[in-house]
């Protein structure tokens, strides 16, 4: 398969959040700010890259009847590594994301890419697919977190945009704000793609 096609597919055409609507639990829960969205996206991308490459490399030795438990073990190993690195180097982000880092193990984006792509493709294509899907997920979470942070706190990446006079829309940093923002973004993307 074409390396660049695999790389770019997950960013726009098959974006995990806006098109495939996968990974909704972390998407809705951690995107209260741009940095949280970006951090969760990057952590997921690292796990996705590691697990896709490992599963692709091991695909000929993993028996078909135990492939899902094998995928979970591989994914859990990479989640543990990423979790330990986050605790060591970005403890504030790790604390903000909390339980959602360990829950990457059962994130349907990672399991779906392992099952649908990495288990039946070579290492280079699996790497490209993981990077593309990971970038698409990171981009989606960062956009969602940015919109919610701007409207809900009047800041972006922690920097104040509007000063003390700004009246934040508190709904935007609460769960209903996540649903509202995600729904509007998905609707906008669907409208734009249907129009094109």
Curated annotation (Swiss-Prot):
Belongs to the NqrDE/RnfAE family. This is Na(+)-translocating ferredoxin:NAD(+) oxidoreductase complex subunit E. It comes from Acetobacterium woodii (strain ATCC 29683 / DSM 1030 / JCM 2381 / KCTC 1655 / WB1). It is a multi-pass membrane protein. Keywords: Cell membrane, Electron transport, Membrane, NAD, Translocase, Transmembrane, Transmembrane helix, Transport. GO terms for cellular component: plasma membrane. The chain crosses the membrane at residues 38-58, 68-88, 92-112, 127-147, 169-189. It comes from the Bacteria. It holds the Pfam family Rnf-Nqr. It is found in: Cell membrane.
């Amino acid at each position: 398969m074409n390396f660049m096609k695999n790389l770019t597919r997950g960013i726009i055409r098959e974006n995990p959040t806006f098109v495939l609507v996968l990974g909704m639990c972390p998407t809705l829960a951690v995107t209260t700010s741009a940095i949280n969205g970006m951090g969760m996206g990057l952590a997921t991308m690292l796990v996705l890259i590691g697990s896709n490459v490992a599963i692709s490399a091991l695909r000929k030795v993993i028996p078909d009847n135990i492939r899902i438990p094998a995928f979970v073990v591989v994914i859990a190993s990479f989640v543990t590594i990423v979790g330990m690195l986050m605790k060591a180097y970005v403890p504030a982000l790790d604390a903000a994301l909390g339980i959602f880092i360990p829950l990457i193990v059962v994130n349907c984006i990672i399991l779906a890419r392992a099952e649908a792509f990495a288990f039946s493709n070579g290492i280079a294509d699996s790497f490209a697919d993981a990077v593309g899907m990971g970038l698409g997920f990171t981009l989606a979470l960062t956009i969602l977190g940015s919109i919610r942070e701007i409207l809900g706190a009047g800041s972006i990446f922690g920097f104040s945009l509007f000063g003390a006079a700004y009246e934040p829309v508190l709904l935007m940093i609460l769960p209903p704000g996540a649903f509202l923002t995600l729904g509007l973004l998905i609707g906008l993307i669907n409208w734009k793609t249907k129009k094109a």
